[in-house]
UniProtKB/Swiss-Prot annotation:
Gene responsible for this protein: rpsL
Organism: Gemmatimonas aurantiaca (strain DSM 14586 / JCM 11422 / NBRC 100505 / T-27)
Positions with biased composition (Low complexity): 125-134
UniProt-listed InterPro entries: NA-bd_OB-fold (IPR012340), Ribosomal_uS12 (IPR006032), Ribosomal_uS12_bac (IPR005679)
Pfam families: Ribosom_S12_S23
This protein's GO CC annotations: small ribosomal subunit
Protein name: Small ribosomal subunit protein uS12
GO terms, biological process: translation
The UniProt record lists the keyword RNA-binding: yes
C-alpha cells in the first residue's frame, strides 16, 4: 500500500474499460458497405454455415458482421446498418447487421420477435394462415 506522500506525488490511476465494439466509436450504429458476403463455420461443439459479411464502415474501418435470421438479400455493395453484439461461436465477429433498414430486408414469414428482424406486423387474416404447423 502506498504512503500518503507517494499518493500526493502520483495519484492513483483509474481502470479504463475496454470497448466491446471499438469500430463503432461510441455510436449505437454505423452505416457501411458490404465488401464480401460469405458463410463460415462456428467453433467446436457447434456445426452450421453462419452467414456473415465483411463491411467497410463510414469511418473507413473494416469489420465482420453477422447476418441474423433465416435468408437474406445482401450482396457486395449493399448498404447496411451495423450494431454491436458479438456471436459467441464465431471468433472475430463482434457486430450484427440490423435487418429491415437500408438494403437489408426483414425476415420473411417471421411472426415472433419481429422487431429484432425488421419484419412488419402481418395483416389480421394472414396471421392465422402462416401460423405454427403441428
Amino acid at each position: 500500500m502506498p504512503t500518503i506522500n507517494q499518493l500526493v506525488r502520483r495519484a492513483r490511476k483509474d481502470v479504463v474499460e475496454k470497448s466491446k465494439a471499438p469500430a463503432l466509436k461510441s455510436n449505437p450504429f454505423k452505416r457501411g458497405v458490404c465488401t464480401r458476403v460469405y458463410t463460415t463455420t462456428p467453433k467446436k461443439p457447434n456445426s452450421a454455415l453462419r452467414k456473415v459479411a465483411r463491411i467497410r464502415l463510414t469511418n473507413q474501418l473494416e469489420v465482420t458482421a453477422y447476418i441474423p435470421g433465416e435468408g437474406h438479400n445482401l450482396q457486395e455493395h449493399s448498404i447496411v446498418l451495423v450494431r454491436g453484439g458479438r456471436v459467441k461461436d464465431l471468433p472475430g465477429v463482434r457486430y450484427h447487421i440490423v435487418r429491415g433498414t437500408l438494403d437489408a430486408s426483414g425476415v420473411n414469414g417471421r411472426n415472433q420477435s419481429r422487431s429484432k428482424y425488421g419484419t412488419k406486423r402481418p395483416k389480421p387474416g394472414q396471421a392465422a394462415a402462416g401460423g405454427k404447423k403441428k
